Each structure stands twice: as C-alpha cells, then as structure tokens.
Design a protein with these regions (language model features):
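Hydrophobic alpha-helical segments at protein termini of multi-pass membrane proteins
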Residues: 1-293
Length: 293
C-alpha cells in the first residue's frame, strides 16, 4: 500500500525538467505539430483548440503512472515471464494504458468543442496533437533518465521513432471513428482501436527485444510504415471534407523540405547540448553517429 493518495501522487507525478530538456522536448512537439497541422487545406487552422488538447494531454499523461502501478501492484503483472508474457504485457498493459490516455484529451475536446469540429481531418489533427502532448511528457521523463549519459542521442532517437509511433497509434483510432460515423458501422472503430493497441504493444516488444538487431529493423520498419499510413489517413480524411476544394493542393515537396529541415534542427540542437556538456570533439563524433543512424 502506498499510504495517502496525495503523497503518492505528488511523489509519482513529479517531473524534473531542466531548461535544455524542456526545450528539446518542445522543439520536437513543435516540429511535428507544424508538419501535421499543414494538412488543414480547406478550413483555417484552429490553434486555440490544438493548444487546449496539447495542454490536456500534458496534464493527463502523468496519470499513466498510476495505471501502471495498479497493473503492477494490484494485478502483479510485470511481463517478466517468457516471450508471450512479454507480448501480452506490452499489448494489454502498455498499449492499452497509453492509447486510452492519449484518446481521452481528444474525446474531451470533441465533446466540449463539437461546434469547432468542422471536417474529418480535425479529429486526426487533435489525435496527433494529443499524441505530441503525451510524447512531450514522456520525452521529459526519458531525457531525464538518460540525462548525463554519454551523449544526447536519445533526443533524436525519440524525436523520430517513438513520436511517429505515438502519433500513428492515436490517429488510427480517430480514423476509425471517422469511418464509423460515415459508414455507420461500428466495426471500423473497434478494428482501429484493436489495431492501435496491438501496433503500440508490438512496437514496444520489438524495441525492448532489440538486443538482436533483427528486432530493431522490425521496429524501424514499423515506423516507416506508420509514417506512410499517417499520410494515407490524412489524405483520406481530406477527401471526405465538406469543404473539399481541388484547387487547394497539399504542398508535398515543401512539407518534405520543412520536415527534413526541422529534423536537422533537432540534430543541431543535440550537437550544441553535447558541445556544452562534453566539449566539441565529443560532439563531432556524436553528430557523425547520429547522421549515420
């Protein structure tokens, strides 16, 4: 037993963010947020709504820890048995808990601000931004754990791989929601929720099994697949917009350039942090490994 709930919560939900880590995590959230909000082609972007869902997500995310504790202490479920036990833990434990946590801020916004939901793509953008809020908080926890390790590789590793998986798994649920609302068949929503949780769980399984590089290739492959899957879902949602206008074309080349430039910025930022902490020669080596990664 954890003693009084309040002590437990304050102890567990404490995050130590130093300026550079908060900046790194914010940079990542901003770069992906900017990239995905550019899919709003027909109706002006609703920045206030995006901000609200982001903040809600940041506030709700730390409570994941409470759910994990219930899983561990009340159900004695740690996933430390064999491979199958591991898979079950990551799908039902991790995938289930984290997808529920990311869907909640979107659900709140959809219910409270239903008037502001103008077209199908709005649901996807909210899901994406909620995932970014989740990843932002999670990145603070991870960067904090790895802080002062030999270098800041963890920043760009998490900025690309984990964030895309979080966005994909969140967005697919709301893509299922759009489909279900349009075709009046619940199977789309149910199917997408299952797909989201299983994908999330399996990605984590591959990542934690990454002693062998084979699994790492799997998880990397999942990220690439997810990135293209996201573009497909966004395109499909745009085609269903009541405000569809064939003259507003998605600026694919420009967006690809923006994405590459922003990821470059993350690398440069990592380089600066490295140089400040460990000196330039070390930073040069790290940058080289990062570029090859």
């Amino acid at each position: 037993h954890h003693g009084p709930l309040l002590t437990y919560l304050t102890f567990n939900l404490e995050l130590y963010g130093t300026w550079d880590l908060i900046l790194a995590a914010s940079l990542i959230a901003l770069l992906w947020g900017y990239y995905f909000t550019r899919f709003k082609l027909f109706v002006p972007k609703d920045y206030l709504l995006y901000f609200i869902v982001f903040i809600l997500s940041c506030l709700i995310t730390p409570f994941c820890i409470v759910l994990y504790d219930i899983l561990h202490f009340s159900f004695q479920f740690y996933g430390d048995g064999g491979f199958l036990d591991h898979v079950m833990y990551y799908i039902f434990g991790v995938g289930g808990i984290e997808e529920l946590t990311k869907a909640l801020p979107v659900l709140i916004c959809v219910l409270v601000f239903s008037k502001r939901m103008k077209e199908p793509v709005d649901y996807l953008i909210l899901a994406t931004v909620s995932a970014l809020g989740f990843a932002f908080m999670e990145n603070l926890m991870y960067f904090d754990q790895y802080y002062g390790n030999s270098n800041f590789d963890v920043i760009h590793n998490r900025s690309v791989l984990s964030v895309i998986m979080h966005i994909f798994c969140s967005t697919i649920i709301w893509y299922g929601f759009i489909k279900t609302r349009m075709l009046k068949k619940i199977k789309y929503l149910v199917g997408c929720i299952v797909l989201s949780i299983v994908t999330h769980g399996m990605y984590d399984v591959f990542l934690t099994q990454s002693v062998s590089s084979v699994f790492y290739v799997f998880s990397f492959g999942m990220v690439v697949f997810s990135f293209f899957g996201l573009k497909m879902m966004y395109n499909s949602a745009l085609n269903q917009s009541p405000f569809f206008n064939p003259n507003n074309v998605y600026p694919a080349n420009e967006n690809a350039f923006i994405l590459i430039a922003s990821l470059g910025m993350v690398l440069i930022f990592e380089f600066i942090l490295d140089a400040i902490r460990f000196g330039a020669p070390h930073a040069n080596d790290s940058l080289l490994t990062s570029l090859l990664a």
